[in-house]
């Protein structure tokens, strides 16, 4: 049964059929999906095997952002996802590196009007961890302290970029403009701090295989 929840997937520029397997897994295991928006860099990136149906809509970077010829990254494109015409208020953002491995229900993505956060736990070597890990470790400590989550001294949780349930209105309201690889993750943390998100539903159960 379809719902008022769309899926947005950003196709990676790497060659291969990851998008094909992602779509197959969605059609098999996420029965409630309304429309699927596939964002590709340009028309040359559209796979020749892809047959668009009524609920599969193709978009290019230029459809979302007029670049005037300059090179743009997918991090910028992510900021313009809420401008997609017809996109539902609740939607799920996917990377095409994800494969859904079992049947999913709406409540596993949106619970009590809150979007659930998929996180991954990583342990670090305190003698070898690098600058980025240092930032993520201390950010994770702060967020987990806000949420009442206890963590091991040398571990941190970071948001899995492969799958992020989102609300369109607060995303647009936040107005992220920074071209940074953590932008969309910071948006999810912003929602968590302001009471939109829920850490509890999917933290333990493994639904996806993320490369």
For each feature predicted by the language model, list its residue ranges:
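Short, acidic, metal-binding catalytic loop of nucleotide-sugar glycosyltransferases
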Residues: 25-33
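N-proximal low-complexity "stem/linker" segments adjacent to membrane-targeting elements
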Residues: 1-18
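Short beta-strand/loop segment that forms part of the nucleotide-sugar
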Residues: 33-43
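Short catalytic/ligand-binding loop motif for oxyanion handling, primarily in non-cytosolic enzymes
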Residues: 17-18, 44-49, 99-104, 108-110, ...
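Active-site-proximal specificity loops/subdomain of glycosyltransferases
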Residues: 41-87
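Conserved donor-nucleotide/metal-binding helix-loop-beta segment in metal-dependent transferases, i.e.
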Residues: 102-132
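Catalytic core and acceptor-binding pocket of nucleotide-sugar-dependent glycosyltransferases
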Residues: 129-211
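Short beta-strand-to-loop acidic/aromatic patch adjacent to the donor-nucleotide binding site
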Residues: 88-101
């Amino acid at each position: 049964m379809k719902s008022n929840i769309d899926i947005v997937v950003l196709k990676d520029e790497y060659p291969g059929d990851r998008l094909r397997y992602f779509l197959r897994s969605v059609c098999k295991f996420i029965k409630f999906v309304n429309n699927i928006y596939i964002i590709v860099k340009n028309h040359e990136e559209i796979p020749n095997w892809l047959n668009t149906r009524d609920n599969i809509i193709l978009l290019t970077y230029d459809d979302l952002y007029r670049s005037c010829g300059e090179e743009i990254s997918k991090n910028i494109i992510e900021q313009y996802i809420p401008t997609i015409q017809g996109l539902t208020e609740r939607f799920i953002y996917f990377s095409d590196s994800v494969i859904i491995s079992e049947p999913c229900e709406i409540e596993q993505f949106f619970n009590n009007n809150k979007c659930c956060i998929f996180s991954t736990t990583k342990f670090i070597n305190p003698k070898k961890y690098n600058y980025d890990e240092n930032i993520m470790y201390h950010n994770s400590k702060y967020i987990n302290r806000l949420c009442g989550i206890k963590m091991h001294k040398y571990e941190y949780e970071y948001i899995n970029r492969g799958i992020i349930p989102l609300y369109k209105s607060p995303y647009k309201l936040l107005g992220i403009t920074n071209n940074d690889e953590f932008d969309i993750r910071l948006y999810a943390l912003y929602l968590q701090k302001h009471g939109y998100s829920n850490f509890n539903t999917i933290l333990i159960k493994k639904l996806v295989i993320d490369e």
